[in-house]
Structure formats: structure tokens, C-alpha cells
Curated annotation (Swiss-Prot):
Domain of life of the organism encoding this protein: Eukaryota
Name of the protein this chain belongs to: Small ribosomal subunit protein uS15c
Subcellular location: Plastid, Chloroplast
Keyword entries, A-Z: Chloroplast, Plastid, Ribonucleoprotein, Ribosomal protein
SMART domains listed in its UniProt record: Ribosomal_S15
Family: Belongs to the universal ribosomal protein uS15 family.
One GO MF term: structural constituent of ribosome
Subunit structure: Part of the 30S ribosomal subunit.
Provenance organism: Angiopteris evecta (Mule's foot fern)
Main location: plastid
HAMAP family found in the cross-reference section: Ribosomal_uS15_B
């Protein structure tokens, strides 16, 4: 299952790879890839740990982006099709 999400479909020039938006996009694609791997290999615990680490890093980046640029955050979660953060 090779489902990749495109960030640069209609957003104009390509963003730099160090930007927060690109890092979240890249982590999301890795999460999708690793999730499909874990559906076939459910006892691959080292991959599960890697998935949890990726999800934690993506969450921290989303928190940072939501605090600094809420419009970009909302656009990004809509493009990627991921849930927003829980507000406390």
C-alpha cells in the first residue's frame, strides 16, 4: 500500500526541507508507510517503537506550529488529513 500525500500539489514553490511544514509532511508519509508494514508484521516491536517516536516528534512539531502560525497549522492538517491537537 503505497499511499503518499503530496504537499506541493498547488502550493507554488517548493518549501525548504528544514521547515516545520515539510518535516511534518515527511513524518506523516513515514507514519503511513510504517503503519502499512505493521499491519502485516504485527509483532515487529522495534518498528512499533520507531512509529511511536515518529508520532511523538510529529506531535511536538504540530504544537510548535500551532503556537506560532495557526493559519499554516490549520491548512497543513487539512491537506494531510490528520487530526488536530486536543485543546486543554
Amino acid at each position: 500500500m503505497n499511499k503518499k500525500i503530496s504537499l506541493h500539489s498547488s502550493s507554488g514553490p517548493v518549501k525548504k526541507t528544514g521547515s516545520v511544514e515539510f518535516q511534518i509532511y515527511h513524518l506523516t508519509n513515514q507514519v503511513i508507510k510504517l503503519t502499512s508494514h505493521l499491519k502485516q508484521h504485527s509483532k515487529d516491536y522495534s518498528s512499533q517503537r520507531g512509529l511511536w517516536k515518529m508520532l511523538g516528534k510529529r506531535k511536538r512539531l504540530l504544537v510548535y506550529l500551532s503556537k506560532n502560525d495557526i493559519n499554516c497549522y490549520e491548512n497543513l492538517i487539512n491537506k494531510l488529513g490528520i487530526r488536530g491537537l486536543k485543546i486543554r
